Amino acid sequence: MKKKSLIIASLLSFISIAWAAETIWIHQLDNIALGLDIKSTENITLSNDGSTVNFNLKDNAGTHSFNYSEIQKVTLGKSQNAVTIAFNGTDAEILNPYGFDGVTVTRSNSNVTINSTATEEVRYEISGTAANGSITINSSSPFTLALNGASISNSSFSAININSSALSTIELVNGTTSTLVDGDEGANGCIFSTGSLKFTGNGTLNITGNTKHAIACEQAIEIASGTINVVSSLSDGLHSTTSFVMNDGTVNVKSIGGDAIDGDTGTILINGGTLNLEVTAADKKGVKSDDKLTVNGGEINITMPADQGKAFRTKANMEINGGNIIVNASGNVVVTANDPSYCSIVKATGTFTMTNGTLKAVHTGTAGKGISADGNISISGGNISLEVSGGNGTYTNTTGDLDSYSATCISTDANINISGGTIVMIVKGNQAKGLKSNGSVYITGGNIAGTLSGNAAVINDNPSYCTLIKSDMDFTISDGTIIATHTGVGGKGISADGTLTINGGIIDITTSGKSETYTSLTGTGTYKSTCVTSDGKLIIKNGYVKAVSATNYAIGSNTSIEISGGITLACGIADSSTSDLSGITSVSGGTFINASGNMHNLTATQCSATTVKYASNISAGTLVTITDSSDNHIISFKAPQAMPQGCSITHPGLKTGGSYKLYTGGSVSGGTVIDSITQAGTFSGGDLAKSFKLSSNFTSL
């Protein structure tokens, strides 16, 4: 009777002060209170036997009845727009304002289950500490789960388990830090959802996945804001199935046994925010998807010591249209079943495209790869900086033959197309390559800079070279800039197995690595450094080419060299046994300065364009100038290295029958300047070396 009196007192209190309150709170014995709008309530009555409390609604809208024994108390208070769950160790206090609108909340100790058939979006606010608790939500409509400084750990299950086909929003309440830890026998994730997840708010979430993933979702994951720290995870940090989208916020992932971000069979889209990822487990990835992977913005920092690891991995196409990416990799190649598996910055089974943004990576692992794609690689903008310094090695391939692996900055099984952007490559590993294409390479713009020091290595009695650009088919440049230095033994600048065509642009390559001999099945051979070389034709139609080799010929072809335009300065070694150019067929136009080497191979038959050969020593750094007989300037160039045998000069300003002068030293001003070559300027000073008349299209002085 005492309890009944308390209930009646509460009802009388309701009658007297209802005008000051908004909600009737019906507190049940399990610490769950249901809220009822006062304005919708006509009156509260007791059954005749006192066993039932009836809350009668206005306008005959119905009655909510409770067993008298189930009610702890009835209070009046303000309305609230959220279901609140406040954990307290193994207990929880719950206020449910939607208990009469399709939201049912039950609990067993600190394990809370929510079943919702509400048609409107419901908000759930979680706070307090649950020593061995969980939140399970079954909902048919979208909802928001607000973590307000909550700390939930569970020894055998997910901390948060969501069963819903609708969008579930997890809000990290501003200024708060929440912590979630699951057990080692739980579900797929410390947070697990069958439907899509969206993270909002500006709070912080620390999460540990002891069973499998830290966050697992069978649909999409979107990060709109907030900070998520994956403290550790047995498998992936964040695992989605249909898509992963990051628009803002920060995600930090470390100490994981799987991938940091795994989009599974879906897509990945990064528009903004910050990703700080560590890839420590072998053959795992920083950002992984089977479908398209796109970076439009944001800051991405990846540390990858894992052997066979991939910073970015997609079985489809990858695009970088913005953002800043920094990767530090040290993982090594691993040979499995006679096939090497590489540690790569980017690995795309499809194509790789970059239009903007920044990608900077340093890779010190053995045979480390920078950007690697099975399909075409297209770069039209942005800034790429890649450094590979890991060593090379050999293995037995699937056919039983000895094969090799080495580092590469950018490589593809198809074609490379560069039309813009800036690419800076530092290549230190032996056999390593800057750009490597199993197809063709097309340069129509952009800027490429390389610093190479890797040496050649002999594999199966054949040398494999450290090369700036290697094309297994054709190489064509029509615009853009390529500037490189190579100090490695047997180093190469640009090498094409097919036709090498220069239609424009600027090429400036210097090689200084020494030559070395090697023993093959057919005898002894020598690998030497070269600047520009091709197995097919080497065709120069336009542009500027400066090729300087301290130990070998500067430009060469195993088929033919055809020069019809542009400006070319080829300066090779002084050893008369080796030409500074190899395989020359014709010089029909343009400006061609052929310095040092076995120049007697250049004949009048080859030169239909007017050419003069000056066969006297020229010291390194000497300015060489040709003027007409009235000292009107035609061309000057500065010798990039010593020219003991002089040089030959082809220039459209030289005409058969004309009289000219050749000077060494002096100075030139004005005119058109490209690197160390000046045309149509003003010349003064210098020493007159020769006065001559061109009696034919080829004249030796």
Predicted features and spans:
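A composition-driven surface/loop motif
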Residues: 77-701
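Short structural boundary motif marking the start of a folded domain
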Residues: 21-24, 51, 81-83, 622
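Surface-exposed, interaction-prone regions used to assemble/regulate multi-protein complexes
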Residues: 24-28, 46-48, 52-66, 76
